């Protein structure tokens, strides 16, 4: 292969070059018709060898037959979802459609059979399903975490709505609260968030009651030109073109619901529509929760007075969050249904060609049982079924030889300490940076908690979307009861502030370590690109 500006090889082209890690003869790699790399294998420490056991997809995610470049790209895509420490520079991780496209582009070694190619794709998709659709307090860029954040935000907004009602003395405002059902209120008291209560947030009558009451709420609470014009049209008996109807609600039309029911001007409505089209409002909700303010109408002057302004702001944000919550749940169900169809089709093809693979006839029945489970019309069981599938994969790949990508990763690390390698794509560059930081000790090694401690996953229901054990509270004056399970308001407020302070300090330390690793890595390199044959 042609070298670019800098030669990291030594000696002539040899028919066979073998790299063996010192004191570890099982870690060896043989390259044919290549020159020898100008690296010292004695620089590889025992800590690096231990940490390298999770730096390739074939070692960590049990894939087989992939080429090194594709193995690295797949490993980087899944590693970003394992922990927030591996997310770089605010980069958005892959959604299901992008990951399915990645699986279609994967290339395998020529001798890899069709059975193991399908098995590798199913294995990668199983890991993706567990990482993307099961809630984890550490994750920020998954759709399940977005769904859980919306639940946490709605729980706080409904609690604040209840507090505003208790402070209200006007009969007109009390009438307004009577037509808006509050799922947090049970017999006059605020209910603690449970899965049953949080599922009630998704009910149709809650959504219809809030979304169809905008004209009445705005006419009572606000006296701006927009609300006065809408009230005047009602007085004249004219139809308001921006009013939402039941048919619009059932079809989830953002143009009718979002742009016309949230007291936004044209510029704000277009910006909000762009946020929803891009990531279903995930970045909008995350930024609002980190900055401790409302997603919309945070600093906007509206309402007849201070009290009415607070009610209208909370009401509009409840409408937005209810809409996003239903859209996100619809996307989750759609994605899990697509994953189930993929598994049914792939497992049926694997079952037909399993006879061509020696020693695997005994697992045919297990594959058929898993395939029948994926055909059940319950999308929320798909992540748990993926875990059952991974248990079968561990048996299937136990007798298949690896491609020695672990040694390639160590050799790549030695090269990165000297020069900058020519990058093939952004995903490959990301994989190199993460592996380099882990081997240098700037980041912890990866660990799949659902594989090392699978018992806790059997307690999950509905993909754990309604779990409140990781909630930390949204606003300083509205702390959910899930924070340490009740107690007086002052105690819960102090615990909330201490928890938020620990989270901020932890994030600051993670950013500082990542930046330190980046500075050291760039300082060690010679800014000259090169290409190597094993990549």
From Swiss-Prot:
The gene is U4. This is Protein U4. It comes from Human herpesvirus 6A (strain Uganda-1102) (HHV-6 variant A). Belongs to the herpesviridae U4 family.
């Amino acid at each position: 292969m042609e070298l670019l500006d800098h030669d990291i090889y030594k000696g002539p082209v040899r028919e066979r070059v073998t790299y063996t890690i010192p004191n570890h003869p099982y870690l060896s790699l043989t390259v044919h018709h290549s020159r020898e790399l100008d690296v010292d294998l004695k620089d590889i420490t025992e800590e690096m060898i231990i940490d390298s056991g999770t730096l390739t997809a074939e070692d960590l995610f049990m894939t087989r037959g992939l080429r090194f470049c594709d193995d690295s790209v797949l490993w980087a895509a899944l590693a970003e979802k394992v922990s927030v420490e591996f997310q770089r520079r605010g980069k958005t991780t892959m959604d299901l459609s992008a990951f399915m496209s990645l699986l279609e582009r994967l290339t395998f070694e020529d001798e890899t059979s069709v059975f193991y190619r399908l098995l590798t794709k199913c294995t990668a998709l199983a890991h993706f399903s567990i990482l993307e659709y099961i809630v984890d307090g550490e994750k920020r860029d998954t759709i399940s975490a977005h769904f859980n954040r919306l639940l946490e935000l709605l729980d706080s907004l409904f609690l604040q709505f209840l507090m505003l009602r208790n402070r209200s003395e006007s009969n007109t405002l009390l009438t307004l609260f009577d037509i808006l059902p509050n799922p947090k209120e049970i017999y006059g008291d605020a209910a603690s968030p449970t899965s049953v209560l949080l599922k009630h947030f998704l009910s149709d009558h809650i959504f219809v009651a809030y979304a169809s009451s905008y004209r009445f709420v705005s006419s009572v609470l606000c006296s701006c030109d927009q609300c006065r014009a809408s009230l005047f049209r009602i007085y004249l008996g004219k139809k308001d073109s921006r009013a939402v109807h039941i048919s619009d609600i059932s079809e989830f039309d953002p143009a009718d619901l979002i742009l016309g029911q949230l007291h936004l001007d044209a510029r704000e409505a277009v910006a909000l529509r762009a946020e929803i089209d891009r990531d279903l409002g995930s970045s909008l909700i995350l930024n609002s929760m980190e900055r401790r303010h409302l997603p919309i109408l945070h600093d906007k002057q509206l309402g007849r007075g201070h009290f009415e302004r607070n009610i209208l702001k909370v009401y509009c944000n409840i409408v937005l969050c209810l809409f996003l919550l239903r859209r996100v749940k619809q996307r989750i169900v759609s994605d899990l249904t697509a994953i189930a169809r993929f598994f049914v089709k792939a497992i049926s093809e694997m079952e037909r060609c399993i006879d061509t693979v020696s020693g695997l006839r005994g697992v045919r029945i297990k594959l058929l049982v898993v395939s029948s489970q994926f055909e059940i019309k319950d999308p929320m069981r798909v992540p748990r079924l993926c875990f059952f599938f991974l248990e079968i994969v561990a048996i299937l790949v136990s007798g298949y030889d690896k491609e020695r990508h672990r040694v390639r990763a160590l050799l790549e690390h030695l090269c990165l300490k000297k020069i900058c390698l020519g990058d093939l794509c952004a995903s490959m560059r990301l994989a190199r940076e993460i592996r380099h930081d882990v081997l240098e000790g700037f980041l912890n090694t990866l660990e799949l908690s659902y594989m090392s401690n699978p018992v806790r996953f059997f307690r999950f229901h509905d993909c754990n979307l309604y779990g409140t054990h990781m909630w930390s509270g949204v606003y300083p004056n509205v702390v959910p009861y899930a924070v340490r399970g009740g107690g007086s308001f002052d105690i819960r407020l102090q615990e909330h502030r201490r928890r938020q302070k620990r989270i901020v300090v932890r994030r600051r330390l993670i950013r500082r370590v990542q930046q330190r690793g980046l500075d050291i890595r760039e300082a060690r390199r010679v800014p000259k690109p090169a290409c190597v044959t094993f990549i």
